[in-house]
């Protein structure tokens, strides 16, 4: 039941976009059509599922105070937590290159449509934010970290695909000239955020 609760909360209550505003640059830039948004959303899910459990292991066995005690008593008091940002980003950047090569090889059309935003997953704050939240919340095991990664990724994917679908519909609407483009997009995102706020009072 704890896993189900964590999964649902990470999608709706603690949504990366609407609760923490993480990954907004690519969220706004790549949400012009559903197909491209779906591709980036799946890439973000894959990155979170791969990197967050790896960073959990890195945090548990290397970074936290006393984590290196398995190397011997002389390492029992070593605290490498100050290296969290650097090492988390290194793991994320390494696997971003792998994802980029896979997408370029097997999905060239998607690779072309995503453009610079695919390699920029390496510095997507939603990916890094997932690892930092994992560290802050001190999950009890790697299973919780994996469930949180999956839920957070699905939440981000849901947000970008929903916005892309709305923006496709808006392209056929008579939007006032002063609000066309990013203006009406900001209003739409704000209304979506208000809708997701309804989940924040739910206790799971």
List PLM regions with ranges:
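C-terminal transmembrane helix-loop-helix hairpin of multi-pass membrane proteins
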Residues: 5, 140-204
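Cytoplasmic-side transmembrane-helix entry/capping segments in multi-pass membrane proteins
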Residues: 36-46, 86-88, 110-121, 176-184
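Structural signature of hydrophobic alpha-helical transmembrane segments
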Residues: 5-18, 78-92, 147-159
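Hydrophobic core segments of alpha-helical transmembrane domains in multi-pass membrane transport
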Residues: 22, 26, 44-53, 89-98, ...
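C-terminal ends of transmembrane helices
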Residues: 22-36, 96-110, 163-174
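Generic transmembrane alpha-helix signature in multi-pass membrane proteins
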Residues: 21-29, 101-106, 117-118, 125-139
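Helix-coil boundary and interhelical linker segments in multi-pass alpha-helical membrane proteins
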Residues: 1-4, 59-82, 131-146, 201-204
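Ordered, amphipathic secondary-structure segments that act as subunit-interaction surfaces
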Residues: 60-114
């Amino acid at each position: 039941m704890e896993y189900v609760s964590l999964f649902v909360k990470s999608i709706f209550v603690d949504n990366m976009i609407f609760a923490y505003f993480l990954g907004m640059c690519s969220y706004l830039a790549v949400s012009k059509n559903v197909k491209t948004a779906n591709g980036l959303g799946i890439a973000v899910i894959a990155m979170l599922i791969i990197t967050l459990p790896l960073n959990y292991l890195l945090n548990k066995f290397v970074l936290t105070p006393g984590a290196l005690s398995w190397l011997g008593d002389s390492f029992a008091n070593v605290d490498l937590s100050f290296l969290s940002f650097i090492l988390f980003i290194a793991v994320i950047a390494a696997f971003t290159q792998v994802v980029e090569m896979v997408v370029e090889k097997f999905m060239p059309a998607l690779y072309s449509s995503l453009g610079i935003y695919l390699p920029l997953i390496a510095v997507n704050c939603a990916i890094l934010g997932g690892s930092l939240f994992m560290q802050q919340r001190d999950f009890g095991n790697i299973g919780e970290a994996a469930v949180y990664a999956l839920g957070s990724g699905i939440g981000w994917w849901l947000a970008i695909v929903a916005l892309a679908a709305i923006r496709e519909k808006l392209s056929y609407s008579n939007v006032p000239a002063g609000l066309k483009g990013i203006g009406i997009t900001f209003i739409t995102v704000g209304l979506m955020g208000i809708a997701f706020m309804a989940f924040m009072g739910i206790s799971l």
